[in-house]
Amino acid sequence: MTTDSAKDSRTMDFLLVTGLSGAGLSTAAKVLEDLGWYVADNLPPELISRMVGLSLTSDPPVDRLAVVIDVRSRLFTGDLGWVLTELEAEPIHTRVLYLEASDDVLIRRFEQVRRSHPLQNDGIDGTLSEGIAAERRQLAVVKAAADLVIDTSALKAHQLRQKIETAFGNDANRTMKVTVQSFGFKYGLPMDADLVCDVRFLPNPHWIPELRPHTGQDADVRDYVLSREGAEDYLDTYRHLVDLTIAGYRREGKRYMTIAVGCTGGKHRSVAMSEALARRLGSEDDISVSIVHRDLGRE
């Protein structure tokens, strides 16, 4: 493996992901994609070096490449040594992630999805237990060469995600991405909303002639809405609810949230309140906020 001191001169992170069938390789691949890695699944060992070369010369170049290989790729001991030796000549920082689980857990997982082990399909071993045992033998040296071994026997999907994020993510990957979306109830609820708040309890600027042509993005409407009784208290209280929800999302490995803020037409109150809420959320370093005014301009 490449040492940490050598990493500084290397231009791409390369992660070889392998392990036992049923140990969570597919989940790991999805997590790495969410973390911004370019993921190639089940790539034959003889094509790995070519994939690395193409990634280094692509425009723009790939900063982080992960290749997921399981027993179907026939990654035997000799293949692994040859691949890693060849990669040492490339300007990359190489790491190996190995996923495993206990026999009883693997058997239960295969039985739950009613699938046979890959080695059973090839006729190498007749029973599920024998297929798992054969795979362990084939990948023993791969495991010994790994930089990180994760036993997924007792892990739920979000717990595996957290471990992978800790090992292979960065600060940007751990940022919660929040979209605050204003809307008008008369046009229907946003289908992608995780949270919905109703600000129709506030007086409607629509009924004030000098404010009616303006929107919640204009200072006069914004000041009017936010100065109404209960507006600031509502924002403070709702911010606390959002904080609790974000904490729960993080525990579950979720990194995206959409908050829908609705009024009657999506022009005045919801626009002003959604922007005020977004300002409150945007003050946190680990939250990235974007604003969408879905129905602004429809009237």
Curated annotation (Swiss-Prot):
Organism of this sequence: Rhodococcus erythropolis (strain PR4 / NBRC 100887)
Name the UniProt record assigns to this protein: Nucleotide-binding protein RER_30260
NCBIfam families listed in its UniProt record: PRK05416.1
Family statement: Belongs to the RapZ-like family.
Function recorded in the entry: Displays ATPase and GTPase activities.
Residues given in the record as GTP binding sites: D70, V71, R72, S73
Recorded GO MF terms: ATP binding; GTP binding
Entries under SUPFAM superfamilies matching the protein: P-loop containing nucleoside triphosphate hydrolases (SSF52540)
Binding site for ATP: G19, L20, S21, G22, A23, G24, L25, S26
Keywords: ATP-binding, GTP-binding, Nucleotide-binding
Gene3D superfamilies tied to this protein: P-loop containing nucleotide triphosphate hydrolases
